[in-house]
């Protein structure tokens, strides 16, 4: 098993050979018959317009090709679109397309297919919808050329076209209306319904005639969803899966069990204090209360005990390698219970208050009681609202509380995080809050470039921290566990490595 680390500007893209086994037994080195992945959760829909960012990326990449794609360092490169070019004021993006691609229903991939897909994304409610808002019109120049006319520059558009906005589904299938339950894409695999059971396993078979077969060497890919980490770990050690996203507390046991452990700087974990106007929780409408919550958390102790030191304490929600990161901001809220109580008293809550906090069970369950105790120590009583997965109204329950805890991706460029969490229509801004400073900066950042844009990002980040929009705890090291029969190149600023970065060990 190989492990290589290649440094980029501020982060490492980790190249590692990871472990594998198929079905119920060990796979041999060089075996391309099957790849089995343990996933963080179940799939809610096959419609790219409704997909939410995060762990569903493997499901999507099995059946859909993106227009662009990301390198291990999160740089953008061609895929279905062979060339891409902006005009001078960044309000038009021209894409040149491959002319040798078909969808699995034999429909031709062309400029009209791109237009249909992007129009569908604009109407959806998934992660792509926010990035799609900037697209005013998709012009079909010719069969292999499209021009995207934008309402304003969008720094995150290329990255969006490399994931959910850019996943291409058959326009015929989109028109038929069954894409949510039956995926039809131009991707490397076909969903095998006969060997698929919702919530248990999803089986994909290699698609004959796929244009980029060498990038996807496995004949079959199986994805098994596990909401609970222990179940996922047991599946790995008993040979039911080959690869999983783990937790820092698993590292000592994983090493003792002979598994490969690799880490990549990644997600932030903490609290989204989303009711900043105090609609459901009047206390959160006072910035002093939100600042008190930040002072109540002993981030260093939590990092050392809960995360095993894998990561860094943080008050920020952006990627450490992004243009928005300001190292000194991590010193803004030292652990200070007395200061927290002082701020609560000044805000009119000398005896504290009750706060509903929702969280995803399994994923956040171990951290929530730790955070609840720290808040209780300064008078904030946490009413826990657990959510078991995002299906059956779980996502709406999670987002419907004044505050919620989750593990959030951090992205490059930083504009992706802006679209995910900061606009009034963002997926993770359910209370639709904004303020004058954020509104101004979200208008100025897209129009700027280079150092000027970076300075505006930093101003935005500083404002968010100072006004305590969030209570981050750590930017953690994402943990990945496996056995030594497959090679995987990890990706910077992406929760899961893309499927094309999995290969049999050499």
PLM segments and residue spans:
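N-terminal lobe/hinge region of extracytoplasmic solute-binding protein
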Residues: 38-86, 119, 184
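Surface-exposed binding/hinge segments that line
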Residues: 85, 89, 96, 130-172
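Alpha-helical secondary-structure segments
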Residues: 110-117, 143-149, 188, 218-220, ...
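Gly/Pro-rich hinge or "lid" segments in bacterial periplasmic/extracellular proteins
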Residues: 162-215, 220
């Amino acid at each position: 098993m190989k492990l290589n680390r290649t440094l980029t500007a501020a982060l490492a893209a980790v190249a590692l050979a990871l472990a594998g086994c198929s079905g119920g037994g060990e796979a041999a080195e060089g075996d391309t018959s099957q790849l089995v992945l343990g996933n963080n959760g179940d799939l809610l829909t096959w419609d790219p317009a409704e997909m939410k960012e995060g762990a569903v990326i493997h499901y999507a990449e099995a059946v859909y090709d993106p227009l662009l794609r990301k390198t291990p360092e999160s740089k953008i490169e061609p895929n279905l679109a062979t060339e891409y070019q902006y005009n001078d004021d960044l309000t038009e993006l021209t894409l040149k397309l491959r002319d040798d691609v078909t969808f699995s229903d034999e429909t031709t991939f062309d400029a009209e297919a791109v237009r249909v897909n992007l129009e569908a994304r604009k109407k959806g409610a998934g992660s792509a919808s926010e990035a799609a808002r900037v697209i005013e019109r998709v012009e079909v120049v010719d069969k292999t050329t499209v021009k995207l006319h934008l309402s304003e520059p969008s720094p995150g558009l290329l990255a969006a076209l490399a994931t959910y906005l850019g996943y291409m589904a058959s326009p015929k299938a989109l028109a038929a209306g069954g894409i949510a339950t039956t995926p039809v894409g131009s991707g490397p695999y076909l969903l095998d319904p006969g060997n698929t059971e919702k919530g248990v396993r999803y089986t994909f078979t290699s698609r004959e005639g796929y244009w980029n077969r060498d990038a996807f060497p496995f004949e079959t890919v199986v994805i098994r969803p596990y909401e609970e980490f222990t179940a996922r770990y047991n599946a790995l050690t008993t040979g039911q899966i080959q690869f999983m996203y783990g937790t820092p507390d698993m590292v000592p046991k994983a090493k003792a069990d002979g598994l490969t452990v690799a880490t990549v700087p990644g997600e932030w974990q903490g609290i989204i204090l989303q009711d900043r106007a105090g609609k459901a929780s009047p206390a959160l409408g006072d910035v002093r209360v939100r600042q008190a919550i930040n002072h109540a958390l002993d981030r260093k102790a939590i990092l050392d005990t809960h995360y095993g030191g894998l990561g860094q304490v943080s008050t920020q929600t952006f990627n450490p390698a992004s243009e928005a990161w300001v190292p000194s901001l991590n010193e803004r809220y030292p652990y200070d219970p007395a200061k927290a109580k002082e701020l609560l008293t000044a805000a009119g809550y000398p005896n504290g208050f009750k706060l509903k906090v929702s969280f995803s069970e399994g994923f956040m369950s171990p951290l929530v009681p730790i955070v609840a105790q720290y808040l209780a120590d300064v008078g904030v009583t946490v009413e826990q609202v657990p959510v078991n997965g995002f299906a059956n109204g779980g996502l709406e329950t999670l987002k419907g509380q004044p505050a919620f805890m989750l593990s959030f991706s951090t992205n490059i460029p930083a504009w992706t995080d802006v679209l995910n969490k900061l606009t009034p229509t963002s997926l993770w801004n359910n209370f639709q809050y904004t303020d004058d400073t954020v509104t101004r900066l979200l208008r100025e950042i897209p129009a700027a470039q280079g150092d000027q844009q970076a300075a505006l990002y930093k101003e935005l980040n500083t404002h968010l921290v100072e006004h305590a929009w969030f209570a981050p705890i750590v930017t953690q090291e994402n943990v990945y566990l496996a056995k030594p029969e497959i090679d995987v190149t990890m990706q910077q600023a992406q929760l899961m490595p893309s499927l094309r970065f999995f290969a049999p060990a050499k």
